[in-house]
């Protein structure tokens, strides 16, 4: 690919949760499109491997700790003198059950990662981008769980709904600086979080990625026979990161769900 065709040529990006899954796929795609990528994660060995494979760098980052996120942004500024894209992708889930048995301490831990981690990322990326004077793109990983009930545990759903809200408010504040803030809501992408959830829901501890993919392909989208992939989400992130592709899009939640949250496939017979 010629440099002129690379949608993120000479851009600098930080991806939290970049060591595997959606984050790692996005790190590779951003690099292919000309970006220098900093992989920020608590998974050191996996993070280093991803960073080395793409010619980027790894930084240990627990997003629940504001100082870690600030240090990742400072690393970008020291190494490259700029930050163009912040992908707040790190997240976690819980082995949840009934609201009546909720462990509030565990909920607080989840919120510290899924919500506070996003707030930390937006805060420090915005500071760097405003200082740079070039604007930028901030992207946050949400979930279809933040859009409708029955797709995730109570605390997980709470956290993803919160992300959608803060994306809208920060887009409102930061737009005057040329900073776009958007979210992505994946559904039916067999990441570790989703596979573990299916194991619990189906009471099948040995359920593997291929089996979960088959279940999603059959029942989890309007595109029968097609499950989501981490590459699908990475392409959505690339779209939102690129000024040429999405320069007039902010405060938006891009849903990558095969149409699942738009309609019910169980009623398809009415169109026959």
Swiss-Prot record:
**SUPFAM superfamilies recorded:** NAD(P)-binding Rossmann-fold domains
Listed binding positions for substrate are 143
Q: Which residues form the active site?
A: 156 (proton acceptor)
KW Oxidoreductase (keyword) present: yes
Gene3D superfamilies in alphabetical order: NAD(P)-binding Rossmann-like Domain (3.40.50.720)
Q: Which UniProt keywords apply?
A: NADP, Oxidoreductase
Annotated binding of NADP(+), by residue: 14-38, 160
Instruction: State the superkingdom.
Output: Eukaryota
Q: Which family does it belong to?
A: Belongs to the short-chain dehydrogenases/reductases (SDR) family.
What is this protein's function? May play a role in tapetum development.
Q: What is this protein called?
A: Short-chain dehydrogenase reductase ATA1
Q: Which organism does this sequence originate in?
A: Arabidopsis thaliana
């Amino acid at each position: 690919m010629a440099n002129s065709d690379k949608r993120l040529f000479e851009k600098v990006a930080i991806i939290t949760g970049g060591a595997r899954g959606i984050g790692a796929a996005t790190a590779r795609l951003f690099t292919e499109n000309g970006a220098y990528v900093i992989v920020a994660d608590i998974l050191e060995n996996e993070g280093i491997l991803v960073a080395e494979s793409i010619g980027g760098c790894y930084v240990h980052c627990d997003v629940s700790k504001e100082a870690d996120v600030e240090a990742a942004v400072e690393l970008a500024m020291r190494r490259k003198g700029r930050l163009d894209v912040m992908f707040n992708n790190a997240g976690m889930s819980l082995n949840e059950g009934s609201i009546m048995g909720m462990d509030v301490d565990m909920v607080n831990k989840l919120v510290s990662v899924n919500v506070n981690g996003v707030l930390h990322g937006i805060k420090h990326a915005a500071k760097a981008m405003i200082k740079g004077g070039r604007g930028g793109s901030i992207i946050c990983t949400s979930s279809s769980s933040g859009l409708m009930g029955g797709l995730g545990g109570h605390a997980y759903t709470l956290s993803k709904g919160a992300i959608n809200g803060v994306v809208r408010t920060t887009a409102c504040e930061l737009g005057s600086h040329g900073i776009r803030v958007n979210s992505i809501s994946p559904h039916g992408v067999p990441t570790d979080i989703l596979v573990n959830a299916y194991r619990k829901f189906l009471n099948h501890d040995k359920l593997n990625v291929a089996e979960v993919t088959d279940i999603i392909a059959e029942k989890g989208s309007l595109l029968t026979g097609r499950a989501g992939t981490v590459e699908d989400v990475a392409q959505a992130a690339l779209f939102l990161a690129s000024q040429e592709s999405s320069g007039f899009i902010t405060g938006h939640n891009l849903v990558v769900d095969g149409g699942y949250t738009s309609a019910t496939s169980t009623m398809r017979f009415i169109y026959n």
